């Protein structure tokens, strides 16, 4: 693979995460405007965004098999066509059914692109370099999560219609589409070059189960936590502005942590540092949940920084459980994380209704403790060390 080709594929991976981050995180900014547009209460409007999450989940799950049937370049180019249709649907339709369909299509495009982006990084890089590259790729999710809400605020403050926010997000996919030209993608399944040697089927092992549970609990815990921090902070007497600042600080610290750990991870065994970070994150979340408002800003900054590398390291370790990175395995771990996203309000909504926001935060804390236990148990069964030894010779 030529260096310029590798750079193009790496940028496609970066932008695939930016696309998903923009679509998922901008929701809170535009929901009120969309509710007014359709003359609906915000509470019923929020349910239609489940179509976005469902599209992401279904496409990540199915793409484990689709990757071996449909070439990656074809998928990305077809995704561009779907993106144009979805944004056009949002712009020219006043029907809630068509809005929901467009959201589902955006989710499908986003999920397919993100699963391809993840696979490209696991395919191009090995060992500890794979972990640091995946982490840097994941930081584009947070970066888009910071940039696009600012773009949305800028547009909405000038009374520009909400759908132009999605048109701006569509420009990320335009960049991906342009990068596919003159770029060679790894061939998979029936498109892969034929070899005389039979392909050995590798068993995944119990380590993949531990990592999948950790991925689900981590994302469910993280989103369950950050979704209810503003309500919890307001309950302690903080202003809405200060509560929002807590969330912004978390994501800013998370992004800085990703950049720092993309360098730091190269010097440590991934399973060991993952266990330490998961334990630290559980402790810092407990400090936030039980601390005074005066200390909340510092504890959430520390939590964002030290938890930033957890999810990507889980995916990296998953890809290292087999000698050759398996798209099915990587997508399985990703799917488990996406299920965590889907379950966020299903799990935390009733808890908040019965016991208040702090109970949801303590539930998230318990989920982080489960992540720590899974990472600790992984140390006894993980195959990443033997595969790293093989690839380094």
Swiss-Prot record:
Bilayer-spanning residue ranges: 11-31, 51-71, 78-98, 101-121, 134-154, 162-182, 206-226, 245-265, 273-293, 297-317, 332-352, 361-381
Membrane topology value: Multi-pass membrane protein
PANTHER family tied to this protein: L-FUCOSE-PROTON SYMPORTER, PROTEIN TSGA
Identification of the protein by name: Protein TsgA
Family assignment from sequence similarity: Belongs to the major facilitator superfamily. TsgA family.
GO cellular component: plasma membrane
Keyword annotations from UniProtKB, A to Z: Cell inner membrane, Cell membrane, Membrane, Transmembrane, Transmembrane helix
UniProt-recorded Gene Ontology molecular function terms: transmembrane transporter activity
Pfam families the record matches: MFS_1 (PF07690)
Positions on the Periplasmic side per record topology: 32-50, 99-100, 155-161, 227-244, 294-296, 353-360
Cytoplasmic side of membrane: 1-10, 72-77, 122-133, 183-205, 266-272, 318-331, 382-393
Location in or out of the cell: Cell inner membrane
Annotated HAMAP family: MFS_TsgA
């Amino acid at each position: 693979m030529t260096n310029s080709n590798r750079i193009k594929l790496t940028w496609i991976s970066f932008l695939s995460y930016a696309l998903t981050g923009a679509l998922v995180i901008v929701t809170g900014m535009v929901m009120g405007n969309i509710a007014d547009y359709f003359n609906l209460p915000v509470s019923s409007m929020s349910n239609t965004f489940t179509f976005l999450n469902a599209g992401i989940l279904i496409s990540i799950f199915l793409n484990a098999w689709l990757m071996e049937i449909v070439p990656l370049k074809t998928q990305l180019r077809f995704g561009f066509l779907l993106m144009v249709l979805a944004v056009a649907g949002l712009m020219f339709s006043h029907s809630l059914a068509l809005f929901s369909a467009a959201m589902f299509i955006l989710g499908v495009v986003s999920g397919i692109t993100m699963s391809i982006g993840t696979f490209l990084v696991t395919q191009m890089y090995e060992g500890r370099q794979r972990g640091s590259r995946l982490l840097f790729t994941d930081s584009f999710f947070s970066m888009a999560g910071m940039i696009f809400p600012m773009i949305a605020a800028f547009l909405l403050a000038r009374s520009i219609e909400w759908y132009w926010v999605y048109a701006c997000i569509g420009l990320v996919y335009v960049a991906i589409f342009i990068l596919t030209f003159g770029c060679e993608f790894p061939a998979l399944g029936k498109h892969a070059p034929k070899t005389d040697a039979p392909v050995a089927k590798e068993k995944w092992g119990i380590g993949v189960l531990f990592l999948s549970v950790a991925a689900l609990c981590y994302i469910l815990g993280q989103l369950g936590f950050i979704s209810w921090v503003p309500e919890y902070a307001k309950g302690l007497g903080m202003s809405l502005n200060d509560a929002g600042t807590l969330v912004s600080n978390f994501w800013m610290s998370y992004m800085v942590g990703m950049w720092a750990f993309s360098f730091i991870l190269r010097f440590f065994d991934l399973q060991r540092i993952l266990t330490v970070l998961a334990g630290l994150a559980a402790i810092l979340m407990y400090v936030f949940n039980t601390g005074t408002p005066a200390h909340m800003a510092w504890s959430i900054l520390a939590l964002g920084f030290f938890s930033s590398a957890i999810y990507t390291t889980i995916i990296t370790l998953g890809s290292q459980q087999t000698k050759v990175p398996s798209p099915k395995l990587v997508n399985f771990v990703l799917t488990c994380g996406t299920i965590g996203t889907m379950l966020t309000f299903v799990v935390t909504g009733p808890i908040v209704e019965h016991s208040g926001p702090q109970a949801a935060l303590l539930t998230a804390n318990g989920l982080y403790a489960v992540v720590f236990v899974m990472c600790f148990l992984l140390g006894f069964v993980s195959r990443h060390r033997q595969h790293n030894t093989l690839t380094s010779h």
